[in-house]
Swiss-Prot record:
PANTHER family: ALPHA-N-ACETYLGALACTOSAMINIDE ALPHA-2,6-SIALYLTRANSFERASE 2 (PTHR45941:SF5), ALPHA-N-ACETYLGALACTOSAMINIDE ALPHA-2,6-SIALYLTRANSFERASE 2-LIKE-RELATED (PTHR45941). This is Alpha-N-acetylgalactosaminide alpha-2,6-sialyltransferase 2. The keyword Disulfide bond applies. GO terms for biological process: protein O-linked glycosylation; protein sialylation. Its main location: Golgi. It is an enzyme of class 2 (transferase). One of its GO terms (molecular function) is alpha-N-acetylgalactosaminide alpha-2,6-sialyltransferase activity. The keyword Membrane applies. Residues 1-8 are cytoplasmic. Residues 77-101 are annotated as: Disordered. CMP-N-acetyl-beta-neuraminate binds at N186, N209, S334, H366.
Length: 404
């Protein structure tokens, strides 16, 4: 008779403990151990990604109220955002577009104070000097060069020495009007959307990570002007989404690659890609960059986001409460967020497709999944904060967010 009573006591104790854990935290972290191609385990980098449950949604207020919460979070970098690279000739050309992102943002009482359009978006050889090294070596990647080899960084930046490396695109190639850009995320909202023709009608199209277009042209189009990534997200995407058709990164004569410098391996891979040689060291040692970027890759095909630009975007637009959590050191804006904000600082007019919206639970995680998969939240990104920002920018008329 004692045995069932003991088992019942253990069961009740376990239930009480589990309930207390669920009530205790606003977020929780654990490792996703489910099998299948949709789980992106960091096989290529010794850094685990942790799940985050959005127990409490962010308030759905006006964009003025939403952004106040974003910009008042605690300072988490070793240097304030005012200590950025003093703007050098950035390669940016004046726009004749009367209703540009810059004009609309500057006229907005909230975003007019947040946007800083003269900050360099890209980094190239002229930025590498003793002053910049001393300043950025105090900040961790991707916001600086802390822990990186000066020789590795310098040898990469010295190869970014063409005019193409100083700007995303040449404005003279789009005479007499507004340069319209589409940034295409991989969200399930695009499945069945029939937005492919509208996306391809833009002058420039940004894609990222597992950017599958074959078989989904009606919904997502096929045009690719820029492919944005970190080496880690690119290689993880090739593993995780191979079963869905992502068997190689986008390649093409006119396609440009945007490197997000999240780790030493991004600088090393970029250098090897420009030189056309195998990766000489690190986690990607022996890799042939040609298989990712094509046989005719040269310096002109590559863009490198400036660490100061990433620092500015995070402190002003996407400073998350996740930074106060146990794994706050892993936090950075998502690849999609960085591509969209890059477009907003360079293009005249921007449309966002496949990004998280308020009704994200109605859609699968990705548009190419044949069966609905729930969106998974990881502790290195704050997708709900990003969703707030996209809604706010849409309401302010600064960009167009595809919703349905």
């Amino acid at each position: 008779m004692g045995s069932p009573r003991w088992k019942r006591f253990c069961f009740l104790l376990l239930a009480a403990f589990t309930s207390s854990l669920l009530l205790y935290g606003h977020y929780y972290a654990t490792v996703d151990v489910r099998s299948g191609p949709r789980v992106v385990t960091s096989l290529l980098q010794p850094e685990l990604l942790f799940l985050v449950r959005p127990d409490t949604p962010h308030p759905d207020n006006s964009h003025h109220k939403e952004l106040r919460g974003t910009v008042k979070s605690r300072e988490f970098f070793s240097q304030p955002s005012s200590e950025l690279e003093k703007p050098k000739p950035s390669g940016k050309q004046p726009t004749p577009c009367p209703r540009s992102v810059a004009a609309t943002a500057k006229a907005d009482p909230t975003f007019g104070e947040l946007f800083q359009f003269d900050i360099p978006v890209l980094m190239w050889d002229q930025h590498f000097n003793p002053e910049t090294w001393d300043r950025l070596k105090a900040r961790r990647v991707p916001y600086g060069w802390q822990g990186l080899s000066q020789a590795a960084v310098g040898s990469t930046l010295r190869l970014l020495n063409t005019s193409s490396n100083t700007r995303l695109f040449d404005r003279h190639l789009f005479p007499g009007g507004c340069i319209r850009c589409a940034v295409v995320g991989n969200g399930g909202i695009l499945n069945g959307s029939r937005q492919g023709r509208a996306i391809d009608a833009h002058d420039l199209v940004f894609r990222l990570n597992g950017a599958i277009t074959k078989g989904f042209e009606e919904d997502v189009g096929s045009k690719v002007s820029f492919y944005g990534f970190t080496v880690n997200t690119m290689k993880n995407s090739l593993i995780a989404y191979e079963a869905y058709g992502f068997t190689r990164t986008p390649q093409g004569k006119d396609l440009k690659y945007i490197f997000i410098p999240s780790d030493a391996r991004d600088y090393i891979m970029l250098r090897s890609a420009i030189q056309g040689s195998p990766v000489p060291e690190g986690l990607d040692k022996g890799d042939e960059p040609q298989k990712y970027f094509g046989l005719e890759a040269s310096a002109e095909k590559f863009k490198l986001l400036h660490p100061d630009f990433l620092h500015y975007l995070t402190t002003r637009f996407l400073r998350s409460e996740l930074l106060d959590m146990q794994y706050g050191h892993l936090y950075m804006p998502s690849t999609g967020a960085l591509m969209l904000l890059t477009a907003l600082h360079t293009c005249d007019q921007v449309s966002a497709y496949g990004f998280i919206t308020a009704n994200y639970e109605q859609f699968s995680d990705h548009y190419y999944e044949p069966e609905k998969k729930p969106l998974v939240f990881y502790a290195n990104h704050d997708m709900l904060l990003e969703a707030e920002l996209w809604r706010s920018l849409h309401r302010a008329g600064i960009m167009e967010l595809y919703q349905r």
